[in-house]
């Protein structure tokens, strides 16, 4: 692959992986199957291995996924909470073992001692104990910074699940110890909670992982307290050095202090015993009381671990082996088209319910017509289905040998199934679109986009409420949200919907309506970049919205900018400029913006402090930063009146060099440009 093509493909892969990371870790709503995610990650790793000069410090291959939510205080981990590299074959496990032996310089024939354990599917957290007392806890977040969920962790296990977070440790623990483990829902507790939801007429959770993650990240700890979360410990860290020789001794200490550890943990001598353990657990995986999609293999000797160290994202002394997804045969009942906020029709497959990875599944989506044709899927087919990554239902392939001749290919409708408008597939596009400007399904999708956390952040306004508003004719565009009568909100909240708490009395409709009105009032005060993103302008994502806001600084200037002015904005190409211009010149769109402003929505530009050491300076960031992401560092510089450039030249005023800084650092030194490390950079930000 040519370098230019490789660079473009790498950029595309990074964006797709970051979007999937955000959906999985921050929104708790996976959008990619694990196999597809792993395929994208492996492709990006291969490109970066072939072209090392294309590696960026903020590449997903260099960092742990999962940025902290803005709803919680940020906590800096004393030692990074790294994620694990994963393998899926015996060959890859052999490569891992060979690499460990090579790095340790072990003689031929000397076996490595490992600890193996089931890979738990929950939310990784860290607990801090001082003098035996629990003093704080956080999620993993991006590995460097997590979310402070102390209040919620205090009540994990409060329902007598016998797998909770101890408030005080037993025995004689060190003066300070950091305990890491997984918060999860055991199958029996998950099923009981879903039964309560169904009895109440509400929507059950899709899987235990989503339920556990959503419960732990509740703003109200009382919601967490009424749900049967459990905690299983698998790591302990002591400042100044661990007092143990092996990981197994750590696990024994954790159990002695009162923590639940996994009874399936085993010590293995050499890779042969690891493979035997893997095979036994694969046979028993669905009999276990919790969801698991693989095993974790860790070097047992702690001195060897220190010698092996870690790469930027993964420890070299551990790896996760992931099982292939469970597959079941079922018969397709029907294929139909759903309509999204941009008018795209997505084929949806309904099939006879089957149990997969502990959950009943009856529906999956196909991306587009091309995928359906490629897989040769017909209405009435028997098909193999799976929950890819144990989460997302997926149709794997048809079983043509079971066809009777009655199966029929699915044809996309000529008219929108929701509004009746014409459906088209433009030349060069893979999707069919509804052309109806007033399509209710599109409107529901646009409202959800407008209200999401990264846009105007209207807390509590999701798809069900949006659909209810559209059904009642209360909302024709975003501005109508601010004119919905209080009584209508009460009526909507009186209908069955997923409660904040499955075990408690339903919140009164009046209180819920008051909360919604308050959320709408808060959303009136927003930033220009959030407002632009919320409008759903084609090709204007978060990054482009932020760039436009910084460049123009004023909504009116953006609305009046012609294509030439828009093409002058960094990272805005001709196609994007054309899309923005077309949107801003559409009279209906202008009316919506005017009505939003009349409703009191005030999109303010972020204040740029044109003073201090960065004011008017050109700054280049190179290498990895531990205190913040590359995007955060860039935003901090720009907020202080500086400009961040991607290359070093004689016009560069300052280079910030993080870990593993490369050619940019060398060029800066050759040109005599001032270079500072991360510590000095953080100090300058505080000036």
Curated annotation (Swiss-Prot):
The active site is at 119 (n6-amp-lysine intermediate). CDD domains: BRCT_DNA_ligase_like, LIGANc. Residues 609-687 form the BRCT domain. GO terms for cellular component: cytosol. SMART domains: BRCT, HhH1, LIGANc. Zn(2+) binds at residues 416, 419, 434, 439. The keyword Repeat does not apply. GO terms for biological process: DNA repair; DNA replication. GO terms for molecular function: DNA binding; DNA ligase (NAD+) activity; metal ion binding. Belongs to the NAD-dependent DNA ligase family. LigA subfamily. This is DNA ligase. It comes from Anaeromyxobacter dehalogenans (strain 2CP-C). The gene is ligA.
